[in-house]
Design a protein with these regions (language model features):
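Surface-exposed, low-hydrophobicity beta-strand/loop segments enriched in small/polar/acidic residues
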Residues: 1-139
């Protein structure tokens, strides 16, 4: 049997300039082996701004109160003095079905930042070979 990978991309948070308001999005990881969450941030508008905070949590349902942090490395700030992309890689083995990203910009009006988030799920597909293919007889 031959195995290969293919990626499914989802826009979790569309591009928006926001200040003071946290944005959240869920990623359904059913059937995936690995997830990458890319957080794209525009440059800070001024030097008084602080870096946005990013956290990733997990749950078996999409009920907001059931999500829990599973790795403290996924609760961090991402510096955006210049435009930047942060990638967060998650091995889904043993993880719950849903990942939730929370992006919190500067909590003052100084920190409006353009942001967007893309989730990429790597799924395994199995190609046919002589060991698992049906026999086709022509003629």
């Amino acid at each position: 049997m031959k195995s290969s990978q293919f990626a499914v991309r989802s826009v979790m948070l569309g591009p928006v300039t926001a200040a003071t308001t946290a944005r959240t999005a869920n990623l359904d990881t059913q059937g995936a082996k690995y997830a990458t969450i890319e957080v794209v941030l525009g440059a800070q508008l001024n030097t008084n701004a602080t870096a946005p905070t990013i956290s990733i949590s997990e749950s078996d349902t999409t009920v907001a109160t059931t999500f829990a942090t599973f790795n403290s490395s996924f609760s961090t700030s991402q510096a955006n003095v210049a435009a930047t992309v942060g990638a967060y890689h998650v091995d889904l083995k043993g993880r719950k079905r849903y990942l939730r990203l929370t992006l919190t910009p500067d909590t003052t009006t100084n920190g409006a930042v353009l942001s967007s988030v893309v989730g990429i799920l790597d799924k395994e597909i199995r190609a046919a070979n002589s060991g698992n293919a049906d026999t086709v007889v022509v003629g």
